[in-house]
């Protein structure tokens, strides 16, 4: 008599071909590269429209509880403070060019 030492195949392994055939017969909806880019662009446009202005984002005054009970006081006020300088803030105007990655930099 033969004895097998391997693990018996799982249900999914036994039905692999059947599952593949069922998948392709179902005619799944696929999106081409051009359509994918169009969908992504329209999503980005919606996100840009939805982004609040700094005033809407960071200058909030409300009654207690309206901001998820962030404070036990009667008013919650958050304001953004700017000094007109971007020094040390991690922001840039896009003029920074990173150095080219070379073997010398890696060593």
UniProtKB/Swiss-Prot annotation:
RNA-binding found in the keyword field: no
Subunit structure: Forms a heterodimer with timeless (TIM); the complex then translocates into the nucleus.
Protein name: Period circadian protein
Protein keywords: Biological rhythms, Cytoplasm, Nucleus, Phosphoprotein, Repeat
Cellular component terms (Gene Ontology): nucleus; perinuclear region of cytoplasm
Subcellular compartments: Nucleus; Cytoplasm, Perinuclear region
Cystine crosslinks: none
The keyword Phosphoprotein belongs to this UniProt entry's keyword annotation: yes
One Gene Ontology term from the biological process aspect of the record: rhythmic process
Function: Essential for biological clock functions. Determines the period length of circadian and ultradian rhythms; an increase in PER dosage leads to shortened circadian rhythms and a decrease leads to lengthened circadian rhythms. Essential for the circadian rhythmicity of locomotor activity, eclosion behavior, and for the rhythmic component of the male courtship song that originates in the thoracic nervous system. The biological cycle depends on the rhythmic formation and nuclear localization of the TIM-PER complex. Light induces the degradation of TIM, which promotes elimination of PER.
Source species: Beris vallata
Annotated Low complexity bias: 82-95
Region (Disordered): 81-107
Highest taxon of source: Eukaryota
Modifications made to the protein after synthesis: Phosphorylated with a circadian rhythmicity, probably by the double-time protein (dbt). Phosphorylation could be implicated in the stability of per monomer and in the formation of heterodimer per-tim.
């Amino acid at each position: 008599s033969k004895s097998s030492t391997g693990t018996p195949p799982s249900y999914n392994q036994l039905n692999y071909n059947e599952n593949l055939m069922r998948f392709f017969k179902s005619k799944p909806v696929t999106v081409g590269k051009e359509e994918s880019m169009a969908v992504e662009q329209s999503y980005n446009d919606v996100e840009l429209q939805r982004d609040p202005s700094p005033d809407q984002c960071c200058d909030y005054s409300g009654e207690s509880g309206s901001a998820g009970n962030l404070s036990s006081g009667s008013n919650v006020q958050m304001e953004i403070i700017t000094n007109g300088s971007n020094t040390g803030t991690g922001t840039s105007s896009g003029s920074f060019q990173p150095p080219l990655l070379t073997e010398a930099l890696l060593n």
